[in-house]
Curated annotation (Swiss-Prot):
Keywords: Nucleus, Phosphoprotein
Residue stretches of biased makeup (Acidic residues): 1090-1099, 1114-1127
Entry similarity comment: Belongs to the RRP12 family.
Protein name per UniProt: RRP12-like protein
Pfam families membership: RRP12_HEAT (PF08161)
Organism: Drosophila melanogaster
Biased composition (Basic residues): 1-13, 1348-1362
Gly residues bias: start-end ranges: 1369-1378
PANTHER family on file: ARM REPEAT SUPERFAMILY PROTEIN (PTHR48287:SF1)
Residues making up the signal peptide according to the UniProt record: none
Length: 1384
C-alpha cells in the first residue's frame, strides 16, 4: 500500500517565465495587487483590516435565523422556510420588491431591488428596466441621464399612487421626450422608451397612435444627419412597435403609410446598424402585426368580444415594400449603385414571402432579370432571396407560380466548375420542389425528373467532392419528402408512376456508367429510393438491385454501402422479390456459394415476409444443404462438409426474419410439424427456431398471429419440456436451456386455457414423482413456476398450499429436503416464485395476494429465523409487496415493526440487488411514519442499531442516509444533531466499512440540509475528518475528496481550512488543490464563454441558414437596449464585421471563362454559366500551380541529356536570366487572376527558383541584422523559398566551367579540382581571407560521440590542434593577425 508523502516541505522550482514573456510587467494573476488596490481609499492604512471581512448583513441574518429556533420542536423544513423569507430591503418607506399593476392595464412583472450603485437612486420595480439597474456604469453619461429620468418618473408615479406599470412609464416618457429640448435628454428618454414600449398594452398604443407616431417621425427628421446611430435605431424600433399594434382599418389612412415610409427609407441606409434595424422593423411589421398573428382567446373576466377576425394573407404595406424594392432595380441603379441593390435584396429575404401573389411575381421577374448581370455577389444574393421565399412555404406563392419560377431558375444554371454557385442553385431548386410538393404534389412530380436528370447525368460526374456531396444530400431530401409522398398509397403511385419511373431510370444510369468517387453516393442514394417507393415499384427497382449486387465483393471499398442498400431493399421489396431477382440457387437447385453473403442481410432486413415462401424455398434449400453436409462428412471431406454445415445453419437462421409480422400466419399449420421435428432431432437448428418463436409470440405481433401459434402449443411445449429437463453438457447448452425456459414462459401465456390446465396437471405429476433437490426436480419446479402464473386464483392457492408453504415453514414433510444445502436451494426457488406471484400484474396473481395476505404475512414473519441468507432479497420483495397491498396499514403494525430490523440487517449484504430492495422497503416504511407524523419515532427505532456489531452499525448508518434523503426536511433539529453526533463517533473508528458508510451519510447531509444547518456543524464535520485513522482515511480517499468538493461548493476552501487542525497536512493539501482546480475551471469557463460569444456573432454564410419564425423575430426586437450596455456584444460584432470584411475582400474576385474562337456576350442568358467565382475549380488552378511550382520535374531546374543540372554563369553572379517561357507562364498566371499591369523585372539567380511571393516579400521586409535563429540566417540551418543556390562542392554541385567540367583534365591528365576552402587562401600572407559575398572561412569539424570518450580525448585534441596550426591560428600575430581583425 502506498503512502501519502507531503509536498509542503519540498523545494519546488516555482513558477518560471514563459518563453518570450520575461519582460511582461502585467501578469494575468494579480491577487496581491488587487488586495493593495482595494485599500487605496482607506484613510488610515494602519487601522485597516488585513483581509476583507466576511461579516455582511446577509451573514448576520442567516446567523440570527439559524440560532432563533427551538431544537426540540422546530424541523429542518421550518428553518429552510424562514431562510427563504428573507428580505434585504432597508428602505423606510415600506417599498417592497413586488407590485401589482392597476386594473385596466397589462400585467407587468417586477424585479428585486438589487443592491447596486443604481439601487441607491432608483427603486424602480418594473422588469422592463432591469438591465439598466443591474448593468449600470457610472462612467457612462447616458446611463446617468437615464437613471435620473427613471428615478424622477418612479417618484412621480409613487406620489400619485401608481403601480409602476408599463403604461404609466410610457405616458410619462412621452411627455418627457416632447418637453425636452436638449439632445442628451431626448436620447436618454428614447432609450428608456425603447426598453419599455414592448410591454405596453396594444389598446394604449392604438389610442396614442397619432401623437406618438408624429413625435417619432419628428425625431427621425431631427436626428437624420446625426452621428448618434443608437437614437435612430431606438426611434425606428419604437415606431415599429406602434405600427404593429394598429388594426387592419388603421392601414387605410395615408398617415399610417407615411410613418411606414419613414422607416422604409432607412432600409438602404449606408450605416449597417441603422439599415439592419430598419429592415428588422419592416419585417416585423409585415409579418408580426396584430392582425397577421393568430387571434388570442379572451379571458372570461375581460369585456372584449371574442370575435375571430378573418385571417389576412398579406399585409397592406407589403405592396409598398414591393414598389420600393422594384424602384431599386432600375438599370441606372444596377450600373452605379450595386451596393444599394444588395441592401434591397437583404430586405427582400425577410419580407418577400409576406407579399401578395402579384407582387411576388413582379419581384421574382426582376430578380431573374438582374441575375444575368456579371456581378456574382448580386446573383448569389438573389439565390438567397429565392431560397428564403421557398423555405417559408408561404401560401402566397401558389403552385402555378412556383412551378413557373422553378422552370425559369433552371435556365440560370451556373457552370459546374463553379462549386459554390452550383450548390446554391441546386439548393434553391430543392427547396422550391419541397414547397411545390406541399402545395400540389402532381406538379412537383412532373417537374422533379428534370432536376434529378441534371443532378445525375451532369453534376454527379464532377471531380469535386464538395459538389458531389451537396448534390447527393439534395437528392436524398427530395426522395424522402417528395417521392415518398407520391408513393404513399397505391392510387398516388399509379398517378405518378411515369415520373417515378423516370427518376429511377436516371439513377440507374449512374450505376451503369463508369465512375469512381461517386459510386459510394449512388449506392447510398438507392437505399433511400428503396425506402421511398420500394413497396409499389418492385419491377422498376429490380434491375438496379441486380446491378448493385453484382458489384459486391468482400474486398470492395464499398462493401458496407452495398450491404446497407440491400438491407433497405429487403425491408421495402420483401425477401421474396429480392431472392427472385438474386436467387440463392442456380437453375438446377444447387446452392451458389458466391451468394451466401445475402443470408445475414436477409435475416436482418426481412419484415412482413411469407411463411409459405420460407417453407417452400428456404427449408427445401436447407434440407438439400443438410444432405450434402452428411454426404461429405461420410466421405471425410471436412472442408466441404464444414461449408455446407454453415450454409444449412445460416438458412435456418433466416427463420426469425420471416417471423417478423408475417403476411400469412395461418400457414403455421403446414410449417409447425417441420419446426417441431427440427427442434427435436437437430440441436444445431434450435437457436434460430427459439428466436423465431419469440418473434411470433411477442407483443408486437397481431392477435391473429397469437391465435395461430397458440393452437400448436401441444406440438411445441412438450418438446420444449423434454429439452429443458435434459441435463446440459457445457456452457453453450446451459445458455440454450435458459433460452428454452424463456420460450416456455412466453408460450404458456399465449396457449389456450384448457391446454394450460392440462399441462399444469402433467407437470405437477412429474414434480411429485421426482427426487427432492435433484436436477429433474428443479427442472419440473421451474416448469410448474412458469405455468402456475397463468392459472386461476384457486389453482395458485392449491399449488401454494401443497408445494410452497411446507418449504417456507420448513415443515417435516416428504416434500421438504432434510439436507441443509438442498433445503437452501428449495427455499431460494420457492421464495423467488412467491416474489413473482406477489409482484405480478396478472389479475389472478393480484387476487391471490389480496385474498391470502394474512396467511402470507404469518408465514413470512414466522419463517424469519428458518430462512437462509440467499433468499433474503426475495423475502424483502415479498414484505414490500405486502406493505404496498395494504391500503390502511398502520405505522405500528406487526408487519411493519418486524420488517424494519430485517431490512436493516440485509441492507448491504451479498449483492446490490438486495441493497436496493432494502432501501425501497425502508423508504416505504419511512413514508408510513411520515404520514402518521411519527418520523422522529422511526429514527429512535433505527438508533438501536448503533449498539450492534460492525455490520449492523454500517447498515444502520446507511438506513439513516436513506431516511435523511427522503424525509430529512421533516426531522427535528435535535434528532438530526443526535444522529450526526453518532455518525461522527463511528467515523473516527478503525472499521473501514463504518467509515465509508459515515462519509456517505455526510455527503447526503450536505446535499439535503440547508446551508445554515450545515454551517452549524461544519466544525464538527471537519474535525471528525481530520481525526480519522490513517488506514480509513486512505481507504476512503475518493469519498473524502467528493465530500470536500461538495463542501467547497457551499463554502469557501478558506473557511474549511480554518476548522482543520494545523498538523493535518493531507486535508490542507487537498483543500489547496480543490481551490486551485476551482479557479482553473472558472477561468476555463470564462474563456469558453468568451469564445462562444465571439463565435455566435459571426455571420453564417451560405444558403443553409437557420429559418427564423416571426416569434424569433419578435423576441429579437425585445433586445433594444443602449449601445454601451452591450459592449461585449459590440466587440464581438466588430470582430465578426472585420472578419466578414476580410472574407469579402477575398471573395470579390470574379472571372469570365472565354473561348478564343467566340465573343462573350454578357447580355446572353447562356453566358451566366461563364461567370465564375474565386471558389471555382478552374480559377483555383493558377493558384495551385503557383503553390506546386516546386513539384515540377527535377524541381524546375534545367537539366542536360545526361541528367546533369545546367547552371549558367548569370545564375552564379545573381544577374537576371529570364527566358521567354518563364515570362509567358508568369503572364498567364497574372491574366488568370485578372491582373493586366506588367510586373517589374527583378534579378533572379535562377529562372524558376523565385516566385511573385518572393518578390513581394523582398519589398516588404526591411533590411535588418539577422539573428542566429532567423529563417533567413545561415546559422539557423533553416531554408526558405527565397534562398539562392550557389554551386560548389562535389557531385552534381561541382563547378560547371570549361576547364574542370570533368574530374581529370584532358590536356594535362592531372586533376584540376582544388581542395575545399582553397578559394579563401591569401596569395601573399598566411591563413585564410574573408571574401565579400561568401561564407566566413570557418573549419567545420564534425562532433561525434567519440569526442566525449575520456580515453580518446587526447587524440581528438591533437587533431584539433593540427587544424588550428594549419589555419595559422597558433602563430600569433604573424599569421593570424589579419584574419583576427573585425570586419564590418
Amino acid at each position: 500500500m502506498g503512502k501519502f508523502r507531503s509536498k509542503l516541505k519540498r523545494n519546488g522550482k516555482g513558477k518560471t517565465w514563459s518563453r518570450g514573456e520575461s519582460a511582461t510587467s502585467n501578469p494575468t494573476q494579480m491577487k496581491h495587487r488587487m488586495k493593495a488596490k482595494s485599500r487605496f481609499f482607506q484613510p488610515n492604512l494602519s487601522l485597516a483590516a488585513a483581509t476583507t471581512t466576511g461579516l455582511t448583513m446577509e451573514a448576520v441574518h442567516k446567523h440570527e435565523q439559524s440560532q432563533a429556533f427551538n431544537a426540540e420542536t422546530t424541523t429542518v423544513n421550518d428553518v429552510a422556510g424562514s431562510l427563504r423569507s428573507f428580505k434585504l430591503d432597508d428602505d423606510d418607506d415600506g417599498m417592497s420588491g413586488s407590485g401589482t399593476a392597476p386594473t385596466g392595464t397589462a400585467p407587468t412583472g417586477t424585479i428585486k431591488t438589487f443592491q447596486t450603485f443604481a439601487s441607491n437612486y432608483s427603486g424602480c420595480s418594473n422588469t422592463c428596466f432591469q438591465k439598466l439597474v443591474t448593468s449600470f456604469r457610472s462612467s457612462s453619461a447616458l446611463h446617468k441621464e437615464m437613471l435620473a429620468i427613471l428615478s424622477a418618473l418612479t417618484e412621480i408615479i409613487r406620489e400619485n399612487g401608481g403601480g409602476e406599470s408599463s403604461t404609466e412609464y410610457f405616458l410619462l416618457l412621452m411627455e418627457q421626450i416632447e418637453a425636452a429640448t436638449e439632445e442628451r435628454d431626448i436620447v436618454a428618454g428614447v432609450t428608456l422608451l425603447a426598453m419599455g414600449i414592448n410591454s405596453v398594452p396594444a389598446p394604449v398604443l392604438k389610442k396614442r397612435f397619432a401623437q406618438t407616431a408624429d413625435t417619432m417621425q419628428r425625431l427621425l427628421q431631427r436626428f437624420m444627419e446625426s452621428t448618434n446611430q443608437s437614437v435612430i435605431r431606438h426611434v425606428i424600433g419604437c415606431l415599429s412597435v406602434i405600427l404593429r399594434a394598429q388594426d387592419y382599418a388603421a392601414w387605410s389612412y395615408s398617415s399610417t403609410f407615411q410613418y411606414f415610409d419613414a422607416i422604409l427609407a432607412f432600409s438602404i441606409h449606408s450605416q449597417p446598424k441603422i439599415r439592419k434595424a430598419a429592415q428588422h422593423a419592416i419585417a416585423l411589421i409585415i409579418h408580426g402585426s396584430c392582425f397577421m398573428l393568430p387571434a388570442i382567446k379572451s379571458d372570461d373576466n375581460e369585456m372584449d368580444e371574442a370575435v375571430e377576425q378573418p385571417k389576412v394573407k398579406h399585409h397592406p404595406a407589403s405592396s409598398r415594400v414591393a414598389k420600393f424594392c422594384l424602384a431599386q432595380f432600375k438599370p441606372e441603379v444596377l450600373a452605379n449603385a450595386q451596393t444599394t441593390v444588395l441592401h434591397t435584396l437583404e430586405l427582400l429575404k425577410d419580407t418577400l414571402y409576406g407579399f401578395k401573389t402579384e407582387d411576388i411575381r413582379s419581384v421574382c421577374e426582376h430578380l431573374l432579370s438582374i441575375m444575368t448581370a456579371a456581378n456574382v455577389l448580386v446573383r448569389t444574393n438573389c439565390f438567397q432571396t429565392l431560397y428564403s421565399l421557398f423555405l417559408k412555404k408561404s401560401p402566397n406563392l401558389n403552385a402555378s407560380l412556383c412551378a413557373k419560377l422553378l422552370a425559369a431558375i433552371h435556365e440560370y444554371r451556373p457552370d459546374k466548375s463553379d462549386i459554390r454557385q452550383t450548390i446554391a442553385w441546386v439548393t434553391v431548386l430543392k427547396e422550391g420542389h419541397l414547397h411545390l410538393a406541399t402545395m400540389q404534389l402532381d406538379l412537383c412530380m412532373q417537374a422533379l425528373p428534370r432536376l434529378i436528370d441534371v443532378c445525375t447525368t451532369d453534376l454527379w460526374l464532377s471531380d469535386q467532392k464538395e459538389l458531389v456531396a451537396g448534390v447527393s444530400n439534395c437528392i436524398k431530401e427530395l426522395l424522402q419528402d417528395c417521392v415518398s409522398r407520391a408513393c404513399a398509397t397505391a392510387e398516388d403511385a399509379q398517378c405518378n408512376r411515369q415520373s417515378v419511373s423516370r427518376i429511377i431510370a436516371s439513377l440507374h444510369k449512374m450505376l451503369n456508367a463508369p465512375f469512381g468517387e461517386i459510386s459510394r453516393f449512388v449506392i447510398l442514394i438507392f437505399s433511400f429510393v428503396f425506402e421511398a417507393c420500394g413497396k409499389l415499384f418492385g419491377s422498376e427497382l429490380t434491375p438496379p438491385l441486380m446491378t448493385i449486387c453484382k458489384r459486391y465483393d468482400t474486398q470492395s471499398a464499398h462493401r458496407l454501402q452495398i450491404e446497407h442498400t440491400v438491407i433497405s431493399a429487403i425491408k421495402a421489396l420483401g425477401p421474396e422479390l429480392v431472392l427472385t431477382a438474386i436467387p440463392l440457387a442456380d437453375g438446377k437447385g444447387v446452392m451458389q456459394l458466391e451468394r451466401s453473403w445475402l443470408l445475414p442481410l436477409l435475416r436482418e432486413g426481412a419484415n412482413g415476409a411469407s411463411l409459405q415462401f420460407f417453407k417452400e424455398k428456404i427449408v427445401a434449400l436447407a434440407m438439400d444443404c443438410q444432405l450434402k453436409w452428411k454426404e461429405f462428412a461420410e466421405a471425410k471431406n471436412n472442408s466441404s462438409s464444414h461449408i455446407y454445415e454453415l450454409l444449412c445453419c445460416q438458412l435456418w437462421g433466416l427463420f426469425p426474419g420471416f417471423c417478423r409480422q408475417p403476411r400469412d400466419p395461418e400457414y403455421l399449420r403446414y410449417l409447425a410439424p417441420t419446426l417441431g421435428a427440427a427442434v427435436e432431432k437437430n440441436p444445431e437448428f434450435r437457436p434460430p427456431i427459439y428466436d423465431g418463436l419469440m418473434e411470433l409470440l411477442g407483443d408486437n405481433q397481431s392477435a391473429e398471429c397469437h391465435q395461430a401459434i397458440g393452437q400448436y402449443a401441444k406440438n411445441f411445449l412438450p418438446r420444449l419440456f423434454n429439452i429443458y429437463t435434459q441435463k446440459p453438457n457445457g456452457t453453450y447448452e446451459a445458455d440454450q436451456r435458459k433460452r428454452v425456459l424463456e420460450v416456455i414462459r412466453l408460450y404458456i401465456s399465449r396457449a389456450p386455457a384448457d391446454v394450460q390446465l392440462e399441462l399444469f396437471e402433467n407437470a405437477q405429476e412429474q414434480l411429485a414423482a421426482s427426487a427432492l433437490a435433484s436436477f429433474e426436480y428443479d427442472a419440473f419446479f421451474d416448469i410448474n413456476a412458469a405455468i402456475v402464473r397463468v392459472q386461476t386464483c384457486k389453482g395458485i392457492k392449491a399449488y401454494f398450499d401443497k408445494y410452497m408453504a411446507p418449504i417456507l415453514r420448513n415443515d417435516k414433510s416428504k416434500l421438504v429436503a432434510k439436507d441443509e444445502q438442498k433445503l437452501k436451494k428449495q427455499q431460494r426457488k420457492t421464495y423467488e416464485l412467491l416474489r413473482e406471484l406477489m409482484t405480478s400484474e396478472l389479475p389472478s396473481c393480484q387476487k391471490f395476494t389480496r385474498k391470502n395476505s394474512i396467511v402470507l404475512q404469518q408465514i413470512l414473519l414466522d419463517s424469519f429465523n428458518t430462512s437462509c441468507n440467499v433468499c433474503q432479497a426475495s423475502r424483502l420483495h415479498c414484505l414490500k409487496s405486502l406493505i404496498d397491498c395494504h391500503s390502511n396499514l398502520a405505522y405500528n403494525d406487526q408487519l411493519v415493526m418486524k420488517a424494519i430490523p430485517e431490512a436493516v440487517l440485509n441492507y448491504k449484504e451479498f449483492s446490490n440487488y438486495k441493497e436496493q430492495v432494502a432501501e425501497q422497503l425502508i423508504k416505504s416504511i419511512t413514508q408510513l411514519y411520515h404520514d402518521a407524523g411519527k418520523i422522529n419515532d422511526f429514527v429512535d427505532i433505527l438508533t438501536a442499531g448503533f449498539a450492534g456489531d460492525e455490520m449492523l452499525v454500517t447498515n444502520t448508518i446507511l438506513a439513516f442516509r436513506a431516511v435523511l434523503q427522503q424525509q430529512g426536511e421533516h426531522l427535528t433539529v435535535a434528532t438530526l444533531e443526535f444522529v450526526l453526533q453518532q455518525v461522527s463517533v463511528f467515523l473516527v473508528q478503525k472499521s473501514r466499512k463504518q467509515a465509508e458508510a459515515a462519509i456517505a451519510f455526510l455527503i447526503t447531509f450536505i446535499k439535503v440540509m440547508p446551508i445554515p444547518l450545515v454551517a452549524n456543524h461544519l466544525e464538527a464535520i471537519m474535525r471528525s475528518l481530520s481525526a480519522m485513522t490513517k488506514d480509513t482515511k486512505r481507504y476512503c480517499r475518493i469519498q473524502i475528496g467528493y465530500l470536500l468538493k461538495k463542501l467547497c461548493i457551499r463554502f469557501s476552501p478558506g473557511e474549511l481550512a480554518g476548522f482543520v487542525p494545523g498538523d493535518d497536512d493531507v486535508i490542507h493539501r487537498r483543500l489547496k488543490m480543490i481551490r486551485k482546480r476551482t479557479r482553473r475551471d472558472l477561468r476555463k469557463k470564462q474563456n469558453l464563454e468568451a469564445q462562444e460569444d465571439s463565435s455566435d456573432d459571426e455571420l453564417v454564410s451560405g444558403l443553409q441558414e437557420k429559418s427564423y419564425t416571426i416569434d424569433d423575430m419578435l423576441a429579437d426586437s425585445d433586445s433594444d437596449l443602449p449601445e454601451d450596455m452591450d459592449a461585449k456584444d459590440e466587440a464581438g460584432a466588430a470582430a465578426a464585421a472585420s472578419k466578414r470584411s476580410k472574407n469579402a475582400k477575398q471573395q470579390k474576385s470574379t472571372y469570365i471563362r472565354e473561348d478564343p474562337d467566340e465573343i462573350v456576350d454578357l447580355a446572353d442568358l447562356k453566358s451566366i454559366g461563364n461567370v465564375l467565382t474565386s471558389g471555382s475549380a478552374q480559377t483555383a488552378t493558377p493558384a495551385q500551380s503557383q503553390k506546386t511550382k516546386a513539384q515540377l520535374p527535377n524541381g524546375g531546374f534545367k537539366t542536360a541529356d545526361d541528367g546533369r543540372l545546367i547552371i549558367s554563369d548569370k545564375a552564379l553572379r545573381g544577374q537576371g536570366g529570364n527566358d521567354q517561357s518563364d515570362d509567358d507562364s508568369d503572364s498567364d498566371a497574372s491574366m488568370a487572376y485578372g491582373t493586366v499591369a506588367k510586373q517589374p523585372k527583378v534579378k533572379r539567380g535562377m529562372e524558376d527558383d523565385s516566385s511573385d511571393e518572393d518578390k513581394l516579400q523582398q519589398k516588404l521586409v526591411p533590411k535588418r541584422v539577422r539573428k542566429g535563429d532567423d529563417a533567413m540566417s545561415m546559422k539557423s540551418g533553416k531554408t526558405t523559398a527565397s534562398s539562392r543556390y550557389t554551386a560548389g562542392g562535389k557531385g552534381i554541385h561541382r563547378q560547371l566551367t570549361a576547364g574542370n567540367s570533368d574530374a581529370m583534365s584532358v590536356k594535362s591528365g592531372k586533376s584540376t579540382s582544388r581542395p575545399a576552402g582553397s578559394e579563401y587562401g591569401s596569395k601573399k600572407a598566411k591563413g585564410d581571407m574573408k571574401k565579400s559575398g561568401k561564407l566566413d572561412p570557418y573549419a567545420y569539424i564534425p562532433l561525434t560521440r567519440n569526442n566525449l570518450n575520456k580515453r580518446k580525448r587526447s587524440m581528438n585534441s591533437r587533431k584539433f590542434k593540427s587544424v588550428l596550426r594549419g589555419a595559422g591560428a597558433e602563430n600569433g600575430g604573424a599569421g593570424g593577425g589579419r584574419v583576427s581583425k573585425k570586419y564590418k
